[in-house]
């Protein structure tokens, strides 16, 4: 198989973890006899510094010319005082909008060998395996008007708009039901229908879409209760589907069940089939260039890319099995280590690559 992958390193530790993921993809290509071509593009602060634009047209063109996109991380305090249109995060929001990346998938799974890294007791996180499906291109982050101004009495005011079309809600909820139908058959739709009109519409649409999936159970949950239930009984969930801001907050909360943001991959899906994959963690500029970054989330994002964009199930599982093998051996990055001893980003990457190349599967026995 020959495929083209757009690589967007971004800022902070983004280039380091993306290099790890790329090296792993090269090992997969070697072992399974594929050909992956890579094209780099700038995004976020790196693009602002070079082009005075968080998402240059060249980057968009490179993405549209690719079969899949792999991103590192964006942001950092260096650009915190920039106007909103010149903030690194604007690049991420813009690429989501331009490529119509409407649904973000965040798998939350606790690795057995990392159960001691979770802040929750083991009995609370046993069998935790769910996916948060977050709407990405609507809601409070994109609604208009969104501005600050001075009113007629000279006082500063600000307004943001939570706006959704029925079609925007419908397609992301349907994606959640499709996933649940292939998993454990349960969708938890999270909203704030006791207060917000947009959430009342969300709940109505969820009920309508549920009629298409008679074998999938639908439950509604208010967002404040969902935040509590993620800690109280996280193993009750299968697929959680919610709007943009709620999903942003809940997915970060859920990430701590695993013990580190550095373990969680994500995928952003488009209706065209051009999907973007990225680790959930941020750019962590304080450890950039020190070899301390955890590459597992980026590597697992590459596994999601292989499975979701290319349909390469065996190859994706080889990567995931390699990660499991390295973790089971006791190797830890700094964020996961329970002592002063830890492995560097590069050392972990080499361990994963070696595990991929050494595994015996039907295809290469």
From Swiss-Prot:
GO MF, one annotated term: 3-isopropylmalate dehydrogenase activity
Question: Where would you find this protein in the cell?
Answer: Cytoplasm
**Gene3D superfamilies found in the cross-reference section:** Isopropylmalate Dehydrogenase
Please name the InterPro entries in this protein's record.
IsoCit/isopropylmalate_DH_CS, IsoPropMal-DH-like_dom, Isopropylmalate_DH
The record ties this protein, via SUPFAM superfamilies, to: Isocitrate/Isopropylmalate dehydrogenase-like
> Which residues are noted in the entry as NAD(+)-binding?
76-89, 282-294
Listed cofactors: Mg(2+); Mn(2+)
* Important for catalysis (site feature) positions: 141, 192
Q: Which UniProt keywords apply?
A: Amino-acid biosynthesis, Branched-chain amino acid biosynthesis, Cytoplasm, Leucine biosynthesis, Magnesium, Manganese, Metal-binding, NAD, Oxidoreductase
Enzyme Commission no: 1.1.1.85
- Residues at which Mg(2+) binds: 224, 248, 252
Task: Relate the protein's function as given in its record.
Answer: Catalyzes the oxidation of 3-carboxy-2-hydroxy-4-methylpentanoate (3-isopropylmalate) to 3-carboxy-4-methyl-2-oxopentanoate. The product decarboxylates to 4-methyl-2 oxopentanoate.
User: Subunit comment for this entry?
Assistant: Homodimer.
Q: Which family does it belong to?
A: Belongs to the isocitrate and isopropylmalate dehydrogenases family. LeuB type 1 subfamily.
Name this protein carries in UniProt: 3-isopropylmalate dehydrogenase
Organism of derivation: Bacillus subtilis (strain 168)
- Its gene name is leuB
